[in-house]
């Protein structure tokens, strides 16, 4: 047990002792926002939670333990400042996973309506132009496979796009051209999961948004590269009897992001008869977020989940997810 927990203890100790603040170091920050409601209720501590298509957004290795032919999930996330994130994931396990699990992920972002302006020789120094609608999109293809009863690996390649409207650029004193502000990037995610024999304790790691530097206009920037290491265990497995119809899952993730100081996510999920679920989480070392709450239910192949995250000076974030597995 000590050899399994030691990496987590070392990582958390490093996080608590870190004083180097990293802020605003990356672009395409929408890739760091998680929309799944189950994960939202558990403070996004999902590195070692496996068996669903949403693993594509956390750790692609999690798909490898899928027991159904396919799993599909749609999530709607009412983010801060009127920004809306919609996510879709699909994973297919042909021939009972003999050939691994194949996955597809989509992430769409609507930044809402913004007022365009342009430089002008008047008292204000600018003129209002037409309104514009910034957006972002990411499409990914993933693969996960269980190499043994305990060890799983997975990866994903994805293409991300961001549209920030257009602007008028003077060419000469009498002529101008319109330029669309569009940028794109190719990124990779990969990870591993290892399941132990000790009460089903699971630990794993993932690397998300690994890519080359991306160019926008004249400046280059990096994507929000994030390294995660985490563990999870059913706390009720320590009770010898009476826990067959219920579970209390505890999960912890330690994050090393390029854009922010190191962070820790803690999550709990209580399940009764694999039908009703209650969730609670805590986000450590975040400026505006702390506790997270969630609930859900599952009837046959259908599951519905909801999560609420208070966001300090902003309105609370609401997420809802609908999943189907067969």
Question: What do these predicted regions represent?
Answer:
Residues 18-326:
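Subset of outer-membrane beta-barrel
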Residues 1-29:
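Cleavable N-terminal export/targeting peptides
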């Amino acid at each position: 047990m000590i050899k399994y927990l030691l990496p987590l203890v070392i990582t958390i100790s490093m996080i608590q002792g870190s004083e180097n603040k990293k802020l605003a170091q990356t672009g395409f920050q929408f890739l760091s926002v998680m929309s799944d409601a189950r994960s939202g209720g558990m403070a996004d501590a999902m590195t070692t939670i496996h068996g669903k298509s949403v693993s594509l957004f956390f750790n692609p290795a999690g798909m490898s333990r899928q027991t159904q032919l396919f799993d599909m999930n749609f999530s709607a996330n009412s983010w801060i400042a009127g920004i809306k994130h919609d996510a879709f994931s699909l994973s297919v396990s042909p021939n009972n996973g003999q050939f691994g699990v194949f996955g597809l992920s989509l992430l769409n972002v609507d930044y809402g309506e913004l007022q365009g302006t342009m430089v002008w020789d008047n008292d204000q120094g600018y003129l209002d132009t037409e309104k514009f609608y910034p957006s972002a999109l990411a499409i990914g293809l993933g693969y996960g496979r269980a190499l043994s009863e305990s060890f799983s690996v997975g990866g994903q390649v994805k293409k991300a796009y961001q549209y920030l409207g257009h602007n008028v650029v003077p060419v000469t004193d009498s002529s101008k051209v319109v330029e669309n502000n569009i940028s794109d990037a190719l990124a990779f995610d990969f990870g591993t999961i290892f399941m132990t024999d000790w009460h089903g304790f699971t630990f794993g790691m993932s690397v998300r948004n690994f890519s080359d530097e991306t160019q926008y206009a004249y400046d280059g920037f990096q994507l929000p590269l994030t390294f995660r290491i985490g563990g999870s265990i059913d706390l009720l497995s320590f009770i010898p009897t009476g826990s067959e119809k219920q579970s209390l899952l505890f999960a912890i993730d330690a994050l090393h992001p390029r854009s922010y100081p190191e962070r820790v996510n803690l999550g709990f999920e209580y399940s009764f008869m694999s039908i009703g679920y209650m969730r609670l989480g805590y986000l450590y070392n975040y400026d505006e977020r702390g506790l997270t709450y969630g609930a859900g239910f599952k009837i046959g192949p259908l599951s519905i989940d909801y999560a609420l995250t208070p966001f300090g000076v902003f309105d609370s974030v609401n997420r809802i997810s609908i999943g189907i597995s067969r």
